[in-house]
Amino acid sequence: MEWNTLVLGLLVLSVVASSNNTSTASTPRPSSSTHASTTVKATTVATTSTTTATSTSSTTSAKPGSTTHDPNVMRPHAHNDFYNAHCTSHMYELSLSSFAAWWTMLNALILMGAFCIVLRHCCFQNFTATTTKGY
């Protein structure tokens, strides 16, 4: 019985020693130029009392809230302009130096061309139908 108590006590102490972690969570602020971070330290307190016949071990953990994922998924970028959460549309500068800009322009031209072809077809069909009606 005492061998099991000793193993249980060592197990509790090793868990307590390995669970002293510090986690950091970033909290977003309304201003676009300041960033703040809040540090939350998780502390674990272990109490072990041993008598000759029985042993009682209890572990109390004071954690603010355990989540498995990071709710603050937006991280500051090196060029914190367009992807900033507080960026508005007038802050974005248009340029033709990227592939995405050329691809968007090509798609817009294709759509406008297809629209013109469809309109010409419909209008031409209507025009020929009305002008050849009397013949």
Curated annotation (Swiss-Prot):
Positions of region (Disordered): 21-73
Pfam families tied to this protein: Herpes_UL73, UL73_N
GO terms for cellular component: host cell Golgi apparatus; host cell membrane; plasma membrane; viral envelope; virion membrane
Species whose genome carries this gene: Human cytomegalovirus (strain Merlin) (HHV-5)
Biased amino acid composition, Low complexity: 21-68
Oligomeric and partner information: Interacts (via N-terminus) with gM (via N-terminus). The gM-gN heterodimer forms the gCII complex.
Intravirion side: 120-135
Family assignment from sequence similarity: Belongs to the herpesviridae glycoprotein N family.
Keywords recorded for this protein, A-Z: Disulfide bond, Host Golgi apparatus, Host membrane, Membrane, Signal, Transmembrane, Transmembrane helix, Viral envelope protein, Virion
Modifications made to the protein after synthesis: O-glycosylated.
Superkingdom assignment: Viruses
Localization of this protein: Virion membrane; Host membrane; Host Golgi apparatus, Host trans-Golgi network
Known role: Envelope glycoprotein necessary for proper maturation of gM and modulation of its membrane fusion activity. Also plays a critical role in virion morphogenesis.
Transmembrane segments: 99-119
Virion surface side: 20-98
Topology of this chain in the membrane: Single-pass type I membrane protein
Chief place where the protein resides: virion
Signal peptide residue numbers: 1-19
Protein name (database record): Envelope glycoprotein N
